[in-house]
Structure formats: C-alpha cells, structure tokens
Amino acid sequence: MTSPFFLGDSTEYVRWRGRKLGGKPRGINDLLVEVGDPFSLRPLERSALLDRCRRFNMVIYRSSAVDPDTSIPRAMGAQLGLHRLDANWLADEDGISPIAVATPSEGRADFIPYTSRAINWHTDGYYHPESRCIRGMVLHCVRAAAEGGDTALMDHELAYIAVRDSSIDWIRALMAPDAMTIPARMGAD
C-alpha cells in the first residue's frame, strides 16, 4: 500500500480521505479522556489517549489534579511515547515553556504567546532540520486565562485534505523540504 501523501497515487488518497473524513470527531467529547493520576496512567486511560491520537491526531485530557508542577506534561508525554523534549531558548530551566503573560525581564515578552495579545495561529518546529522535527507535543493547561484564552486545534491531516482538494500544486509546494523554514530568532536582535 502506498501513502495517501504520495501525490502520484490518487486512488489510495481517495480511499484514505474517505476513511479520514468519515471518522473525524463529531464534537469535543470525542476527543476527551478523563485521567485520574497524570503521573501514573491506568492502562485504559493510556489506551484511550493513544486511540484519540491515532484517530484524530490529538486528544484532550481532563484531570482533577490541579498541581502546576511542570513535571506533569513531561510525565504524560513519556507515558505516551514522547521522550525527546525540545527545550527552546525561551523555555525554563526544566525545558518546559510556560505559556503565560511574561514580564519584560523574563525575555519572552516580545513573543505573542507570552503576552495578553490575541494570536491567530501558531505552529512549532519549523525552525528545525528534519532530525529535530517536532512530531508531538503536550499542551498542559494549569489555569484558565484571566480573559480570552480560546484555543482552536486542528488535525493536520484534515488541513492536508482541504488544501489538496483545493489545489494539488499548493500541496506540492508545501511539501518542498524548505517550504516551512525561516530563520529562527536566536536572541534580542
């Protein structure tokens, strides 16, 4: 079987597209998994989390644990197979990036995710070579935003379908190895 992402095989793409569109989530409850202890997932919780990731390329977990301990997202990720943390230059010493309003002295205040300003879209990992490509992430919400704080998540495979159905040339251009590479901002300059 060839990949639905191989542009030379429209038959496999049409089959995969039908399965993907037929199995997309109908609402947020399809994505939601209740987790008792995020440090020690029960087998059924882990299985449900991985199932949502496999089917929808995302999962939303809810837990009664309110501890802001940054080892929670690290522990959750490890239990789901995420073992290499990409500690970007704005991350804390533990490699975790707290998405919260930052003070100017923290060095993050110039970047929209660390301000109270609205952000229309964001993606991670496009500054890296293939060997450091980000293939998964954990966004762990500790507290609600004081104001706003809406988050919209998108399955990248559904985005692929929408773009490919509009123009295979757009997909061809976006699949070029250098399509999403821009110089990383490495400091204050």
Describe each PLM feature range:
Residues 2-40, 54, 94-189:
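Active-site environment of non-heme Fe oxygenases that use a 2-His-1-carboxylate facial triad
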Residues 42-45:
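Amphipathic coiled-coil/heptad-repeat helices and related helical stalk/stem segments
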Residues 47-53:
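Short, flexible, solvent-exposed loop/turn segments with mixed acidic/basic and small polar residues
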Residues 53-60:
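TRNA-binding/sensing appendages of the translation machinery
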Residues 62-65:
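Structural motif
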Residues 67-74:
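Short, conserved charged micro-motifs
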Residues 70, 86-101:
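A surface-exposed partner-binding patch
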Residues 77-86:
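A short alpha->loop->secondary-structure connector
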